[in-house]
Amino acid sequence: MFLRHCITFTLIALLAGCAGFGSREALQGHGDPQQWRAHKAQLSSLDGWQINGKVGIRAPRDSGSGTLFWLQRQDYYDIRLAGPLGRGAARLTGRPGGVVLEVANQGRYEATSPEALLEEQLGWQLPVSHLVWWVRGLPAPDSKSKLTLDGDSRLASLDQDGWQVQYLSYTEQNGYWLPERLKLHGKDLDVTLVVKDWQPRQLGH
């Protein structure tokens, strides 16, 4: 069960690279489209961050919660889970072309992509590269999305590839307004993320 929890969240949290975003968006809500575009352009410049927070997972057969540490440096990631989510700790590291999952007292798992590792370990197909965008309050650029803006022209919710993401609150860090509480709902899976500490960075290319 622990491995199931760890793979579920950490693989959703992976990326396929920080490419530029397209215009496959359907906008609605109370925000101003021009302000949204400016906000999106600012957030897309972030290619590094450190996050500390909590994550909860609900699935038909099991559920749990734990602490999250996520270090992102361009295309390199280091994601760690610990606490009641399982009986130990998990660490996921890698970059495009190579992913390593280490689970305390259970083993080490490798794949060429997070999608491949998820498919191999669980047999699930999920948009695992999207959360690197969603966690910043952006839609993933490679598929269509339906966006609802709040009164501050930030995302209140988005629908993309069969997932619904709700943005419950934001926090301001270093001039960036970033999601603080998110709820993600997919087929047979709900994920709640509460960010306690955001440290955004622009590392350059």
Curated annotation (Swiss-Prot):
One Pfam family cited in the UniProt record for this chain: LolB
Main location: membrane
Keyword Protein transport: yes
GO cellular component: cell outer membrane
Lipid sites, type S-diacylglycerol cysteine: C18
PROSITE patterns referenced in this protein's UniProt entry, alphabetically: PROKAR_LIPOPROTEIN
Compartmental location: Cell outer membrane
Protein name as annotated: Outer-membrane lipoprotein LolB
Native source organism of the sequence: Pseudomonas putida (strain ATCC 47054 / DSM 6125 / CFBP 8728 / NCIMB 11950 / KT2440)
